[in-house]
Amino acid sequence: MFFMDISGQRMLVIGWGKTGVASARFLISRGARVVVADEKNLSLENDVLSKLGEDHGQSVELADYGISALAQVDAVVPSPGVPPFHPVLKEAVKRCIPVISELELACRYLQTPMIAITGTNGKTTTTSLIGEILSGSGRKVFVGGNIGTPLVEYVTGPQTADCAVVEISSFQLQWVDQFHAFVSILLNTTCDHVNYHGSFEAYRAVKERIFNNQGKQDVAILNADEPDSAVLAESLSSPVFFFSTTKMVERGLYQEKDRLICLDGEGKQEFYPLSMIRLPGAHNVENVMAAILASRACGCSPENVINAISGFSGIAHRIEFTREIGGVKFYDDSKGTNVGAVKRAIETFSDPIILLMGGRDKDGDFETLSALLQDRVKALVIFGEARERIQERIGGIVPTVLTPSLKEAIAAARRQACAGDVVLLSPGCASFDEFADYKARGRFFKEEVRAFA
C-alpha cells in the first residue's frame, strides 16, 4: 500500500455514475475538497450531491464539463468510461496534473490482499467463481470492482474481508501507477474497445498492467494458449502459473481428456474431474482453471475447490439458458459485447444456431466470424445501430435478416427457428443504442422469449 494524503486537496471527479459517486464519497471522507464535472448538467440540488455534503459537513462543487474544470485542481479522478483522449484528461496530462483512476485511488488505501482478474472475456465468471471458492473455504471475501461494488467503496469502510476479489477492466487500468495485486490473472485478449484505446496493441498493453509492481512473493496467472503469453511471462517479476486446454504446462493447470491436472513445478500433482464443471463451453473450462489456480494460491484445499465449482451454475447473461419452446432453445449471452465473446458462444453449441447480433458498434472485427458462421450458424438476424456495418462484413454468408430493434430481431429469429435449433443472443456490440446496459438488454430478451409461451 502506497498511502496518499489527500486531506485538503482539491480533487476533480469526472463522471457521476456509480464509480464517480463512490470516488467522491471516499475523497470527502478523507478530507478532500471535491469538484464534480459530468456531461449531464448536474445541480447542487441533486439528491446524491446534497446528501454527500450533508453527511460530511462539506459542500461539493460543480464544474463545467470542459477544460475550465481544471482550475486550481490538485488531481483528477475520471470514471472508467471517460476515454484517455478526453480534452480534460489530455489537458491535465499537459499541465502535469495527476490523473488517478478509481482503482489506483482505492489501491493507495487498500489493506486487504487482492486477487485481480482481467481479460477481454470471462472476467465476471472467473471473479464470481473465485469468490465462491474462497467463501466456501471459510474466508470472508469482498467481490467487486468492475462488477457490483467499486473497490473504492470497499476501502471507504472498515475493510474487514480476508481477501478482495476484484474484476478489472482495461478502462480502470488506464490510469494506474502504484496498483498491486498479490494474485493477478490475465484470461485472454481479443480485439475490443479499440474506439477507447486507439489500437489493439494499446488495449493489450493496458491489460498487461494488471501485473504492475508484482514481485517474487506474488503470483501471475496466464493463459498458455494465448499468443505471446510466453514472451509476457519472461518479462514478469512474479512466479507465473499457466493454464491450458490444449497442451501440458510445467507449472499450472492443463486439460487431459476428462480431467484437469495441476502441477506446482516441484513434482506435486493434483487432479480435478471435468465433470465438476456445470458451465457450458470450452471457454468456461479456461475460466475454471484460472479460478482454481488463484484459489490454490490462497491455500484452498482441492476438496473445497471441487465443492464450490460443482455448485456453481454461472452468471446471468453469459450463455444463460432462458427457455425451450417447441423444441427451440433460447440463450441469453447479452454480455457478449465483442467478437471474441460471440466466437466463444457459437463454439459452445453443436445444434444449428439462429444468431442475433447488433447494437452499438465498437469497431468489431466481424469478418473473423465468417468460418464459424458457415459451419455452425443456420441464420443471422442483425439489429440496431450496427446492423448495416455487420451486414457489409458478414451478411449473406448465411441467410440474413436486418431489423431496426432487438424486439423485431427476436420475433424474426422465432420465425426462422425449428425444433432442434438454438436461438442465441450474442450481440458482439454494446447495448447503448437501445438499452442502459447489457443487463437491461438481456432482461428484455428473456421477457420477450417468456412471453411466447
Curated annotation (Swiss-Prot):
Q: Which reaction does it catalyse?
A: UDP-N-acetyl-alpha-D-muramoyl-L-alanine + D-glutamate + ATP = UDP-N-acetyl-alpha-D-muramoyl-L-alanyl-D-glutamate + ADP + phosphate + H(+)
| Swiss-Prot/TrEMBL keywords | ATP-binding, Cell cycle, Cell division, Cell shape, Cell wall biogenesis/degradation, Cytoplasm, Ligase, Nucleotide-binding, Peptidoglycan synthesis
Gene Ontology biological process: cell division; cell wall organization; peptidoglycan biosynthetic process; regulation of cell shape
Enzyme Commission number(s) from the entry: 6.3.2.9
Q: What is its main location?
A: cytoplasm
Q: In which pathway does it act?
A: Cell wall biogenesis; peptidoglycan biosynthesis
Q: Which Pfam families match?
A: Mur_ligase_C (PF02875), Mur_ligase_M (PF08245), MurD-like_N (PF21799)
One GO term in the molecular function aspect is: UDP-N-acetylmuramoylalanine-D-glutamate ligase activity
Q: Where in the cell?
A: Cytoplasm
- Keyword Ribosomal protein part of the UniProt annotation: no
Instruction: Give the InterPro entries listed for this entry.
Output: Mur-like_cat_sf, Mur_ligase_C, Mur_ligase_C_dom_sf, Mur_ligase_cen, MurD
**Residues annotated for ATP binding in this entry:** G119, T120, N121, G122, K123, T124, T125
GO cellular component terms, alphabetically, are: cytoplasm
**Top-tier EC class:** ligase
Q: Which family does it belong to?
A: Belongs to the MurCDEF family.
Give the protein's function. Answer: Cell wall formation. Catalyzes the addition of glutamate to the nucleotide precursor UDP-N-acetylmuramoyl-L-alanine (UMA).
Protein name per its UniProtKB record? UDP-N-acetylmuramoylalanine--D-glutamate ligase
Natural source organism = Syntrophus aciditrophicus (strain SB)
